[in-house]
């Protein structure tokens, strides 16, 4: 009797804490996203996370239609499940068409071999987007770079831009200083992007040299889906405009002690160069009337120092493996590809490398780290407007 009494008292003493734990249990939510990636003429990737492990999908319909299709990620006969981070690819869409989508998800409380226990089922609001138009004569997009984990700066730069006009945002590298903390892409720029535009319009991340650093850098591709092929480098087509994204790799030699023998960027850049040769030979690229390249580190060759305004800067840049290797590999290909303009970053200052016959056959605009770029490609050319964080226009020109 005495033992039973002690057990009862102990249970009663535990009840308040048990009830408190039950009362403070966090609800099942979509806690990041959704955000759009890899939008094309006929497909899109919808990304989001849930607060607990679950089984998720995307419902999609043409705007104005009641016919809803459910899309999930399936691999080797298994639907993706018991996870929190989701990237659901949707294909077979119509070009230049408005769609509406929402997230549906069920929490998974238990996942045993022969018994699955589901919990709460949730659904997001409906959000709208439009597939790209293969016949478009004009496209407008925004470029920002070197944000270095400063979400407030990211927000400020986006606020400078007419986001209602832009079809897409390109983040041109060093959006994070390194990737060393779980959830860092969200707090650095994805959450801000979702708030400003990314539920309805996509962004792509052109990696800088800083995103390759940190013990989590190899997981970055779980959050960023620039292309359906799963590469950071790729090409977007907006009707008559082609935009090539190149992945610069690190700025120093692969053998530099700071990398501890863990990087392989010389080979990676050479791989991209072979891919780029195929792109510029393709019918779709040759049909484009305007061609733009985006890469974080500006490719550099010695003869660029012949321009007086860059005579001091170029020799310094040539001491960095990233600049020199990109110049060696990429400029011979791009010089034959009728490129209109290249956008780069990295220098944290505003620099224009002008077109030089036989050296670099197009201007390279290096944006600083406190400005955003508005780019509008049309039959008039490639219009570029750079506005700094104070709202001052520092460059406005058509190429």
Map each language-model feature to its residues.
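Structural recognition of the beta-strand scaffold that forms the well-ordered cores
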Residues: 140-144, 167-172, 177, 202-207, ...
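Active-site-proximal segments of metal-dependent phosphoesterases and phosphodiesterases across multiple
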Residues: 259, 265, 286-340
